[in-house]
Amino acid sequence: MNPYILSIMLISLGLGTTLTFASSNWLLAWMGLEINTLAIIPLMANNHHPRAVEAATKYFITQAAAAALLLFSSLINAWQSGQWMIQDMSMPMSALMTIAIAIKLGVAPVHFWLPEVMQGIKLNTGLILATWQKLAPLALLYQISNNLMPELMIALGLMSTIVGGWGGLNQTQIRKIMAYSSIAHLGWIISIMHFMPSLAIINLIMYIIMTTTMFMIFNTLNSTTINALAINWSKFPALSAITMLALLSLGGLPPLSGFLPKWLILQELTNQNLALTATVMALSALLSLYFYLRLSYSLTTTIMPNTYQHMLNWNIKTKITFILPTMMIMTIAMLPISPSIISMF
């Protein structure tokens, strides 16, 4: 892609999200979401491959349907209340708005587009889709968190954690695994949004850090399938060992960073007399942990048979090397500073 066009698309992505963040009006928020959608579609179709074009088409149709539902619900709410303010939402329209935002996020049971779209695009674009594109819809949910239906949020969260874990079990494509991982993590964020929005923000920040780290690692290793991971131990032994810890952190194992948000969410759900919900979500996290362990096993304990012994490639010549160690440290070792993180919110 032409660098000037790429710059325009990236600036538009930032502009759309910023507009949604700063808006207190549903029309401006809707405009920001649409700018986001239109800006990422050329990045998706940049690959000039039928799968990339198919992914961009699926994404456009899904996001257009969600945007129409969001605009319809905000219009009905404005007709009933007489104003377009985001914070003033009546209960029926709040549920309809939640469903529209869930479609944009890829939350179960309206998640079917996300794995297919993720599989058809490059890892760099997949990183944007899995992290940056979640910010604007979640910002809207944060603003209407007091008017959300707790039963609907718990149902969406439970379904997402279960579907995210169950759907990733039989996958061999890393991009699809990361898509189901995204669905599962969004389930945790959605389930706590009504009860403690600040905790949802902490979970979102940790999710973005861990997911960014994993996409950067897979891009460095140039691996898109589980089988491709098996040859990386002989090429990048140090990176492979640290990647295993990052995967386990993504699964929420203590004492790694990913344990912090899950622990706090389970504690808050229990305080809200939702012990059964917390138990089901904790058990569904074991499903996700299985495919993280599967990736770790392929990466660190299997070596593809070959007759030629590769020289150990300890120096990774890549442009993102200076960013990757910082992201890895944050992914693995943020639990000791968790009291400081909690006090910030």
UniProtKB/Swiss-Prot annotation:
Coiled coil: none annotated. It comes from the Eukaryota. GO terms for cellular component: mitochondrial inner membrane. GO terms for molecular function: NADH dehydrogenase (ubiquinone) activity. It is a multi-pass membrane protein. Its main location: mitochondrion. Keywords: Electron transport, Membrane, Mitochondrion, Mitochondrion inner membrane, NAD, Respiratory chain, Translocase, Transmembrane, Transmembrane helix, Transport, Ubiquinone. It is found in: Mitochondrion inner membrane. The keyword Transmembrane helix applies. GO terms for biological process: mitochondrial electron transport, NADH to ubiquinone. It catalyses: a ubiquinone + NADH + 5 H(+)(in) = a ubiquinol + NAD(+) + 4 H(+)(out). Its EC number is 7.1.1.2. The keyword Transmembrane helix applies. It is an enzyme of class 7 (translocase). The chain crosses the membrane at residues 3-23, 25-45, 59-79, 95-115, 148-168, 177-196, 201-223, 236-256, 273-293, 322-342. Core subunit of the mitochondrial membrane respiratory chain NADH dehydrogenase (Complex I) that is believed to belong to the minimal assembly required for catalysis. Complex I functions in the transfer of electrons from NADH to the respiratory chain. The immediate electron acceptor for the enzyme is believed to be ubiquinone. Belongs to the complex I subunit 2 family. This is NADH-ubiquinone oxidoreductase chain 2.
